[in-house]
């Protein structure tokens, strides 16, 4: 029979970890002074008066670069623990990591061929 008896500390930590941000945001919204002045609604550009529209659309290529960065950043997060315990894991873990990296390389080559990484 499956039981949740051994997970009290996990649930307590999860509850506390969920309540802390909610309480912090709620407290700051209640305590913080609110100002409706026009100066507060303008965008900040390094102390210079804003010129033009503050809402501009970024081209899609920026999002593609950000997406590729996130994919390879997550790859690094997954491969670091594997590299730290490489000797204990054996050949099967090496093959699994190799397949993981190959799938990512295939995805990178596909994005490259489709022109997703072209700047112009």
UniProtKB/Swiss-Prot annotation:
NDH shuttles electrons from NAD(P)H:plastoquinone, via FMN and iron-sulfur (Fe-S) centers, to quinones in the photosynthetic chain and possibly in a chloroplast respiratory chain. The immediate electron acceptor for the enzyme in this species is believed to be plastoquinone. Couples the redox reaction to proton translocation, and thus conserves the redox energy in a proton gradient. GO terms for biological process: photosynthesis, light reaction. Belongs to the complex I subunit 3 family. InterPro entries: NAD(P)H_OxRDtase_bac/plastid, NADH_UbQ/plastoQ_OxRdtase_su3, NDAH_ubi_oxred_su3_sf. The chain crosses the membrane at residues 10-30, 64-84, 89-109. It is found in: Plastid, Chloroplast thylakoid membrane. It catalyses: a plastoquinone + NADH + (n+1) H(+)(in) = a plastoquinol + NAD(+) + n H(+)(out); a plastoquinone + NADPH + (n+1) H(+)(in) = a plastoquinol + NADP(+) + n H(+)(out). NDH is composed of at least 16 different subunits, 5 of which are encoded in the nucleus. It is a multi-pass membrane protein. This is NAD(P)H-quinone oxidoreductase subunit 3, chloroplastic. One of its GO terms (cellular component) is NADH dehydrogenase complex. GO terms for molecular function: NADH dehydrogenase (ubiquinone) activity; quinone binding. Its EC number is 7.1.1.-. Keywords: Chloroplast, Membrane, NAD, NADP, Plastid, Plastoquinone, Quinone, Thylakoid, Translocase, Transmembrane, Transmembrane helix, Transport. Its main location: plastid.
